[in-house]
Amino acid sequence: MAVKSDAWIAKMALEKNMIEGFIPQQVKVNQKGEPGLSYGLSCYGYDTRCIDEFHIFSNVNPQAAGFVDPKNIQATSKHFIVHKGDHCIIPPNSYVLTSTVEYFRMPRNVTGLCLGKSTYARCGVHLNTTPIEAGWEGHITIEISNNSGLPVKVYAHEGIAQILFFESEDCAISYADRGGKYQGQRGTTHAKV
């Protein structure tokens, strides 16, 4: 199983609609024409953008539980403050949930891995997502962690992560076949049990 090239990614995006909102080249400027974090097709991956809505984790809500419980979604969701804008300031040692601008449709013989951009990593910002499973479709929810001791600025509609695609033989049971709980998610999706 080898990582797929730009030519393969472009073909799948254009012919199979694997990436809705696909940009066929690297874009290195923001919406104002100023230098920005690159997004679009790269040599062996696709650099995706995040939307302008950020769910900022906060531990200052007095009505929320004193801990995060992934099995008690109602209590956990009270820890988030929703912010809309062209950027987001992530507090030190905290994180933000957001999602990709692009909508992905993974074929049943393709799995994706989402990795952070080196520019952010060099500022103490790290991304966490799970594998993008064969047969899954939706906007990718991304967790952006600020591991530095200072607030960090993250930009909407600019490059946030790179998706690598791996093709293999068809799986026996895809994410869609299993009826995965995040199938078809739109926008930022909090944890589900």
Feature annotation, model-predicted:
Residues 1-193:
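Non-catalytic terminal segments and appended small domains
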